[in-house]
Amino acid sequence: MKKILLAAALSLTFLTAGAETLSSIDQTGTWIYLYNSQGRKYKTLSTSSVGEVLGYSSTFFVARNGAWIYLYDADGRKYKTLSVSTVGEVLGVAGDTFTSRNGAWIYTWSRDGRKISTRSAR
């Protein structure tokens, strides 16, 4: 029983070891810096590959580079690519969702890049 508990504890430690909590993003010049909840810089990304950061939460951030919207996890890994013509203008990021406006419509998207809801922009 002790061996099972020890194995479970070790596996949980390794699974969460790389997961950072994104507290702040600083975009200066050609670099984007990610900071954790202790205020420590833990990742540096190039603006030439990421583009412009449009918004962030503690678990992910949204960036635009040319005609593409990219979703990145808190560790700075790109995991989803969406077209600007589909998403439109990103209005904000909150929690595990982000909101965009495309023409006369406002869309709410999940952090996975799935459209959750649509409403008229009035």
Regions found by a protein language model. Give the residues of each.
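A short beta-strand motif characteristic of beta-propeller blades
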Residues: 40-51, 77-83, 115-119
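Positively charged n-region of N-terminal signal peptides that target proteins for export
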Residues: 1-4
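Short loop/turn segments that connect beta-strands within beta-propeller blades
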Residues: 37-38, 73-75, 110-112
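Hydrophobic h-region of N-terminal signal peptides that target proteins for export
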Residues: 9-18
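C-terminal partner/receptor-binding element of secreted or periplasmic proteins
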Residues: 102-122
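Mature extracytoplasmic domains of secretory-pathway proteins
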Residues: 44, 54-81
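Short beta-strand elements that form the blades of beta-propeller/WD-repeat-like
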Residues: 20-27, 32-33, 57-65, 69-70, ...
